Amino acid sequence: MTEAPTQKKARQGRWTLFALIAVTIAPVLASYLAYYVWKPSGGKTYGELLAVQPVPAFKLATLDGQPASLAELKGKWLLVMSDSGACAQSCLDTLHALRQFRVAQGKEMDRVERLWLLTDATQPSAAALQQADGAKLLRAQEAIPLPASQADSFYLIDPLGNQVMRYPRSAEPGKVIKELTRLLKNNENIG
């Protein structure tokens, strides 16, 4: 008869030990699952998020040949495209889209600047200059140090001069506008 209470205590002690081990291991297991298995659904971007780093300095000039730099445009969000001065139809479409992205920001549009980096000595056509109305036009005098695929992309540079996003030229305007609006709203203190 003395063995039954001892077995009962032993069984109860084992359950207590298992409970303590489970309580100790549960947070570690939960953190592992949260980090490696359950991916959060938020935080998705439409454009390609680039490694945030300053755009390296490179030689630029105005259309009349005066030296210029991106530092002159610090303090504004920049929508940057690069293309030849000849500006084919895809270039004209991108210039138009960049203007629409800026105008769609309403009262915040003063925080956004458009920049067309000309990659050659060709003078832009009247149609291209009309689409670029209000944009800064600078001639790149050396290779542009932005990530690859610049011919079919445009970029977003933050007010501190860091590359932030890359979008395809065929980007859906509504998605770009929504993302730019969200960026401006969440970063009111930097430009």
Language-model features and meaning:
Residues M1-R11:
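N-terminal Lys/Arg-rich, disordered targeting/topogenic segments
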Residues R14-Y35:
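Hydrophobic membrane-insertion alpha-helices, especially the h-region
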Residues A22, L29, W38-A71:
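N-terminal "domain-start" segment that seeds a small globular fold
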Residues V55, L73-K76, M109-R111, S149:
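Extracytoplasmic
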Residues A71-L92, L98:
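Short active-site neighborhood of thiol/selenol oxidoreductases, capturing the structured segment around
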Residues L95-L115:
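Conserved helix-turn-beta segment immediately C-terminal to the redox Cys motif
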Residues V112-L160:
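Short, internal strand/loop/helix patches
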Residues I144, P159-G191:
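Thiol-/selenol-based redox modules, centered on thioredoxin-like
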